[in-house]
Amino acid sequence: MGCRILALEDQSDFVWGHVSARDPDGRGAWMKAATLGFDEIGPEQVILVSWDGEVLEGEGRRHAEYPIHTELLRARPDVASAVHTHAPWSVAFASTGAPLRPISHEATLFVPPEIARFTKTGDLILTSELGVDVAVALGDRNAAFMVQHGIVTCGPDVVTAVMTAVLLERACRTQIRAVGSGGPVTWSSDEEALSKRGNCYPPALLQQAWDYLARQVSAA
């Protein structure tokens, strides 16, 4: 369902982008199979990828950028799911180098402090070494811009990781539109932003938002 929600939220880029979930037995990460779009993914299109990139279970090829997920999960025991997409508003916003501001509720999930940025390369993450670099750039935060590439988000479960990607894209869209209006732009103080984060996005409310989007997917 996470993949289909990302498709609903316009984060598809043909067959590229992925969602992962930590294998409960420690064997690696469950990921969508390559060569398929987010909107095509069901349980049969999910494969288990080992820490070294071997397909252990399921039918299909693994994504070349699996190290984004395996190295992030290795580095962050608190994380059970990661998302990588080429979300268009986020890619456009990150290219400006501007700081993300808490203009909207959505942005308060990420700032303060400033959202992480991975800038070592805008190319594909094809090696474990680059996967480690992404994890280092992310640090202990819930999201990072992969500048000239996409985004990576994470959480203690698939619901949180996916909703974090959804909310980051919406925050970037709001800021681009606000700045593009040509007028002055205001945003919440750090104190208010942190308060809004706690009030707007506790796990129960993220679950409600997920459930709503899941209903939209089912109705489509």
Listing of model-derived features with the role each one plays in the protein:
Residues 1-220:
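Glycine-rich flexible loops
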